[in-house]
């Protein structure tokens, strides 16, 4: 298992908490907690070794498209494809936006 920590400047604020996916589903779960800060801190535990560049590229793309919210994001990944990872991350941000 690889542990990855990333930090990004936040360009928007959300409130509350959100969860998307289930660890037992075989792909990934994402937990988001809003914070009054200027950054999004991301902690990833993944079964895929040497994947930091992939995660960095995914978050860079998300940041360009919609901006990233302030808070804490915890990801438990068990080999999800980049498409599934993006969907799960966007789901927690959408849920928190409507909390």
UniProtKB/Swiss-Prot annotation:
Main location: cytoplasm
Pfam family, one: ACP
Protein's name according to its UniProt entry: Malonate decarboxylase acyl carrier protein
Modification O-(phosphoribosyl dephospho-coenzyme A)serine occurs at: 25
Keyword Cytoplasm belongs to the record: yes
PTM (free text): Covalently binds the prosthetic group of malonate decarboxylase.
InterPro entries referenced in this protein's UniProt entry, alphabetically: Mal_deCO2ase/Cit_lyase_ACP, Malonate_deCO2ase_dsu
């Amino acid at each position: 298992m690889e542990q990855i920590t990333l930090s990004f400047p936040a360009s928007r604020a959300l409130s509350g908490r959100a969860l998307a996916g289930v660890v037992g589903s075989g792909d990934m779960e994402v937990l988001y907690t809003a914070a009054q800060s200027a950054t999004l801190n991301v902690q990833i535990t993944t079964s895929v070794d040497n994947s930091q560049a992939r995660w960095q590229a995914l978050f860079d793309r998300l940041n360009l498209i919609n901006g990233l919210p302030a808070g804490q994001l915890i990801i438990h990944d068990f080999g999800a494809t980049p498409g599934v990872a993006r969907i799960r991350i966007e789901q927690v941000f959408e849920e928190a936006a409507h909390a």
